[in-house]
Amino acid sequence: MTTPESFALLMARTDVVNLFKNLKFVIIDELHTFFDSKRGHLLSLNVARLRSIKPFQVIGLSATLKNTNLAKKYISNNKNTKLVSTHSKVAPEITILNSGNRIPWSGHSPRYALSEIYSEILKFKSSILFVNTRAQAEILFESLWAMNNKNKKIAIHHGSLEKELRKKVEKEIVEGHVECVVATSSLDLGLDWGNIDLVMQIGAPKGVARLVQRIGRANHTINTPSRAILVPTNCFEYVECIAAKECVELNFLEDEIYSEGSLDVLAQHIAVSYTHLTLPTKA
């Protein structure tokens, strides 16, 4: 298990041929996230180079993929690339929080619904509250902690925290020591927890695929519906939440964005690929 960056370093080793001599499969998780990023371009280059060293099968995984032709093109230009798809028979249970207070016309704070948010997380053993920015995560975490008269075990998780602290929070969620975590996109991908009972999206999700991905954190099992509550922070976001909810119910996803390979990534790849070779001094 590795990342595109660490994989690139492995490909630069002098023993790369021996290192991957028994390789049979390469599995790319969350495939859709690599189509429009330099990390994706780097990964594609190294997979292609590794293929020239040792043939193997590439498997791409995604829960929110719409453009299957793009996925096939990214994995391989081979016409024999096959698509295997499945759809959950259990639809997610999505609601929009009904607060007794008026939704603000503007702003991005859920302060008007704090008591309702706290009441919801008290109903469930474990929950994740997704927000869209790190500042929102800090403010919401502090607000919930200040009103936490039931001593709910609440934590925070975002990319600006030290790696060791993030890993500790993730471990404590799995072990059941943390009952609620306020998080940004740092918990969107790559973590399979079957013990999360509720997901709350604070603010508009800013994308149907992102909402589906976040909803999937709850009850990460096949035959159990995921529970999600959307909490708009202003009137316009209320409309966005309605639209996002309807799109999920209709199985509608946005098209993935694809960008051509970056020349700076190509230059880096060429340089790293030849670092272990002795090059002639005369051109």
Predicted features and spans:
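Helicase motor core with emphasis on the C-terminal RecA-like subdomain
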Residues: 1-4, 12-272
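Conserved small/polar residues in nucleotide/adenosyl-binding loops
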Residues: 275-283
